[in-house]
Amino acid sequence: AVFHTTTSSEDAYESSHKFAQQQYDIVVAIGGDGTVNQIARGLLYTKTKLAVIPVGSGNGLARHLRIPLSYHSAVDAILDGNTISIDAGKINDRIFFCTAGLGFEAVIGDKFNSSGTRGLFTYMKFCVKEYVKYRNEKYQIEVGGRRFNQDAFLITFANCGQWGNNAFISPTADISDGMLDVVVWKKTPAVSMPFVTAELFFKTIQHSEYLDTYRCKEVKITREKQGLIQYDGESGVMGDEINVTVLEHAVNVIVPKVSSPSLQSKHVAPQLKDFFKK
C-alpha cells in the first residue's frame, strides 16, 4: 500500500491520476465530499476503483452509497465490498459526483467554506443568517425540450439524492441511471420555509408544491449575471450561462455488500489499521 497525504486539490487530482496510469487497482480517498471529488476526478474512465473512507462534514456521497462513517467499518467495506459504476456530472468545466447548485445553496456553501468551522450547526447558522437578506434570482431554464423563465430560491443538480448530513434534496435520484435530477426550489413563503426545510430530512421534499424536479441528461441555465456555484461542497464563480451534463459510468466505486452483516473492524488490513493509529 502507498499512503499519500495531499497538499492541494491539484495534488489530489494529479496523484490519483498518476496511480490510475500506473494501473493501481484501488485508490482510497480519506476525507469529505470535496476531497473525494478531487481524487475521483483523476480516476475518470479508468479501471482503477475508488474507495472512500468518509471523514468530512456532510459526507453526501458516502451516505448515498451507504458507506459506513466509522473508518474501521469503512475499511472493512473496502475489503469485502462490491464494485459499481457511478455517473458524474459536469457543470461548465467543473466535475461533481454528488450535487452542484446555484442560488441560496451556493451562497451558504461559500460562507461555510470561508468560516473555517465545520459541522451541521455552523451550516444551519449561516442558513438562518443569510435567509433573512437573500433575494431569489431569475433564471431561464432549458430542459427536456422546454424553455421557461423561473424565479428560484435555488437550483440543485443532483447526481445522488442528498447534499450531505442526510438532507435529501432529491430522494429518488439514482447515481447510476445516466440521468441528473434538476431540482428547482421556487419562491417559498417565509412561514412555510421551516416546514419545507424539515422535509429534506424526512425524504419527502419531492412532494412539496414549492419544488419542481426534472430528470434529464443535460440542462442549460441562464441567469442575469455571473455568480456563485457549489459543486460537491466546493465554491466557485461562473458566468451567466451554465451548462450541466451527465457523464455516464464515469468511475468505478467500491461499496458495501447490501447483504453483508454488520461490518466488524477486526478484519481491517494490518497496514491500514496501523495507519489510523498514527
Predicted regions and their residues:
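ATP/NTP phosphate-donor binding region
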Residues: 1-27, 37, 41, 260, ...
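Catalytic core of DAGKc-family lipid kinases
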Residues: 6, 45-49, 53-157
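N-terminal glycine-rich "phosphate-gripper" loop used for MgATP/nucleotide binding
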Residues: 29-33
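Glycine-rich phosphate/pyrophosphate-binding beta-alpha loops
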Residues: 101, 105, 156-169, 235
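Gly/Ser/Thr-rich active-site loops/lids in small-molecule metabolic enzymes
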Residues: 114-122, 171-192
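A generic structural signal for short beta-strands and their flanking turns/coil linkers
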Residues: 135-137, 151-153, 176-181, 215-219
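ATP/nucleoside-binding phosphotransfer catalytic cores, i.e., glycine-rich phosphate-binding loops
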Residues: 143, 174, 184-278
